[in-house]
């Protein structure tokens, strides 16, 4: 392999503690002339269980050291909240839980690499997935001078058995089992599930797929209401508790909503999506807190933004969903779209009540000092602010283009009848 002959002195590996990245450490040292391997692990809220013993595992696999970087608060505050303001939902369903975590992980990865003086970075993404593109696009934007190593595009190993044998031959301990049914990825926003029976789109997900939320059928029979308070587009309170930067903070707010939503089976989706690399894939996602937050935020938008502003913000959200999914966070386009969404969010101050019940998160109350809703205008009864006779002129002008088209093309119903 020509690429493997390139001189690399020090490489920083994005390390999870799993089978793949545990095998990558000795592979790097063997294929890149005994280079020093430093492990980097990003804590984006995947849970203590996932991070338990990760430093020890990395050292046991051959890494010289392991950096575990706590990114939880920054992730929610600087990535999730700005994306929330765009209203981005990929292909109408997916709340982008995996995609939105990649930019901050890539940034922290590069920061560690520059700190230790590495000349390369390495990831464990497969050659079929989206993440290889997302990470490497971010690397290119942040540190184009660094070499990127992607073992799954180089080595000959193709199965979990191959990886386990590789580690066993080198007497490297690994607790991974030969049979792993599902591939999962978790962070503060969500958890994703792929593989196993999910590879057949006609197969219903088993109960074992879902690990974060209660089955909606088993959720409480009594609904629960959650009140969210926003200030200039930022979540600052839930049920009267301060979650602003002066209070418990953004990460704790999301954890609170995750707990509430999970108990009521909120946030489950089972979708087939179009991958960036061209193929379709099926995934099951659990985003309980995010589903509540998105419902509340959009509920506030409908109360405050005028029609044309909301229409434009929705167009930004549609385009930005692809920007995030494709890994283009560190681009001028992303910066412009985030700024646009943030400008609309400045008006979004108010309270929203969301009812949680057996998988449903429904907005049932909303109020704001910036509300454009006027009961006087909206009523169907008599009022002093809107003369219904004025509608006739509006309708005539609104339908003028249709009238002209019909007259010029003889396309009216009368002409057709004749």
Swiss-Prot record:
Give an example GO molecular function: argininosuccinate synthase activity
Give residues annotated as binding L-aspartate. Answer: 126, 130-131
Q: What is its main location?
A: cytoplasm
Q: Does the keyword Ligase apply?
A: yes
Q: Which CDD domains match?
A: ASS (cd01999)
- List residues binding ATP: 14-22, 42, 124
Specify the pathway: Amino-acid biosynthesis; L-arginine biosynthesis; L-arginine from L-ornithine and carbamoyl phosphate: step 2/3
Pfam families membership? Arginosuc_syn_C, Arginosuc_synth
Reaction catalyzed:
L-citrulline + L-aspartate + ATP = 2-(N(omega)-L-arginino)succinate + AMP + diphosphate + H(+)
The residues that the entry says bind L-citrulline are 94, 99, 130, 134, 183, 192, 273, 285
Intracellular or extracellular location(s):
Cytoplasm
List the InterPro entries hit by this protein, alphabetically: Arginosuc_syn_C (IPR048268), Arginosuc_syn_N (IPR048267), Arginosuc_synth (IPR001518), Arginosuc_synth_CS (IPR018223), Arginosuc_synth_type_1_subfam (IPR023434), AS_cat/multimer_dom_body (IPR024074), Rossmann-like_a/b/a_fold (IPR014729)
Q: Which PROSITE patterns match?
A: ARGININOSUCCIN_SYN_1, ARGININOSUCCIN_SYN_2
Q: Which HAMAP family match?
A: Arg_succ_synth_type1
Q: Identify its protein family.
A: Belongs to the argininosuccinate synthase family. Type 1 subfamily.
| Subunit and partners | Homotetramer.
Task: Please state what the protein is called.
Answer: Argininosuccinate synthase
Which source organism does the UniProt entry give? Colwellia psychrerythraea (strain 34H / ATCC BAA-681) (Vibrio psychroerythus)
